[in-house]
UniProtKB/Swiss-Prot annotation:
Organism: Staphylococcus epidermidis (strain ATCC 35984 / DSM 28319 / BCRC 17069 / CCUG 31568 / BM 3577 / RP62A)
SUPFAM superfamilies: Winged helix' DNA-binding domain (SSF46785)
Keywords attached to this entry: Cytoplasm, DNA-binding, Transcription, Transcription regulation
Residues annotated as domain HTH marR-type: 9-139
Predominant location: cytoplasm
Short name of one Pfam family: Staph_reg_Sar_Rot
GO molecular function: DNA binding; DNA-binding transcription factor activity
Family, per entry: Belongs to the SarZ family.
Record protein name field: HTH-type transcriptional regulator SarZ
InterPro entries in alphabetical order: HTH_MarR-typ, Transc_reg_Sar_Rot_HTH, WH-like_DNA-bd_sf, WH_DNA-bd_sf
SMART domains documented for this protein: HTH_MARR
PROSITE patterns attached to this UniProt entry: HTH_MARR_2
Top-level taxon: Bacteria
GO CC term (a single one): cytoplasm
Amino acid sequence: MYVENSYLSKQLCFLFYVSSKEIIKKYTDYLKEYGLTYTGYIVLMAIEDDEKLNIKKLGERVFLDSGTLTPLLKKLEKKNYVIRTREEQDERNLQISLTERGKDIQNVLSDISQSVFNEFNITQEETQNLVEDLQNFVTKNFDKTVEK
């Protein structure tokens, strides 16, 4: 149980941890229906409609290394959400793109974020301010750019 005046309640990293954990739990409830984890969801949402991305670029976009991405992409490929193809010029370079099923599911999944945040006591304006503040925090402190 969350205790407002506790030492932990004043710790930024604890508040990030609790928020992240609880938000992901809400997403998980919605994603079960599609056989997806939260990580699978963010990977699918990170690939643009007709885009081909190599694993390195995709990893940078979702802040995951290739060791985490490779097995996840294999699972997404088995579900026919993505296709992995090798470049003819350099077979070491694996390109990731959405299948038609992946594009269809991406359209369905795009509404999940709004559904999740409708369950919280937060206004649209507060949500937007929080997103902007966190984008700035990540960009300034972790030498990573969050695509806006």
